[in-house]
């Protein structure tokens, strides 16, 4: 028989840098999960993606064991990395902070495809383009 899930925890953590300090410790500790076991496993599975923020969905079972699913990094993080900027514009309609090419946009859309609610790369590109526009990043051909 399948184990019963008692909690579903969603966190966004830097790849390869999870530690028991907040927000990881309190989120997992209240459900009785072995925090160090999670940190070691998360860091091992994300060590090749250092520098990105990787969202994780942790399922906690009634026997205090857990499993987790790694998601793709947020589109805003991928866009900022491609444009070479720290953060988006505070006023995206007036102040543009960077540029990405259509090829970079397609690459980001293909990376995000598993987590988006579409199977079409063109639709994914439009979704990511909207995020870029809201960050003050322009798309050059």
From Swiss-Prot:
Signal peptide: none annotated. It holds the Pfam family Ribosomal_L11. GO terms for biological process: translation. It comes from the Bacteria. One or more lysine residues are methylated. One of its GO terms (molecular function) is large ribosomal subunit rRNA binding. Gene3D superfamilies: Ribosomal protein L11, C-terminal domain (1.10.10.250), Ribosomal protein L11/L12, N-terminal domain (3.30.1550.10). PROSITE patterns: RIBOSOMAL_L11. GO terms for cellular component: cytosolic large ribosomal subunit. Keywords: Methylation, Ribonucleoprotein, Ribosomal protein, RNA-binding, rRNA-binding. The keyword Iron-sulfur does not apply. Part of the ribosomal stalk of the 50S ribosomal subunit. Interacts with L10 and the large rRNA to form the base of the stalk. L10 forms an elongated spine to which L12 dimers bind in a sequential fashion forming a multimeric L10(L12)X complex. Forms part of the ribosomal stalk which helps the ribosome interact with GTP-bound translation factors. This is Large ribosomal subunit protein uL11. The gene is rplK.
């Amino acid at each position: 028989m399948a184990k019963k899930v008692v909690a579903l925890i969603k966190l966004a953590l830097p790849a390869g840098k999870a530690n028991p300090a907040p927000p990881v410790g309190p989120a997992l500790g209240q459900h009785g999960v072995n925090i160090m076991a999670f940190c070691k496993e998360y860091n091992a599975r994300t060590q090749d993606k250092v520098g990105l923020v990787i969202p994780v969905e942790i399922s906690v079972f009634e026997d205090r064991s857990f499993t987790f699913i790694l998601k793709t990094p947020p589109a805003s993080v991928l866009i900022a990395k491609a444009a070479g900027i720290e953060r988006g514009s505070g006023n995206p309609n007036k102040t543009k902070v960077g540029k990405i090419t259509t090829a970079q946009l397609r690459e980001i859309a293909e990376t995000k495809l598993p987590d988006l609610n579409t199977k079409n790369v063109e639709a994914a590109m439009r979704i990511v383009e909207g995020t870029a526009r809201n960050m003050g990043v322009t798309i050059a051909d």
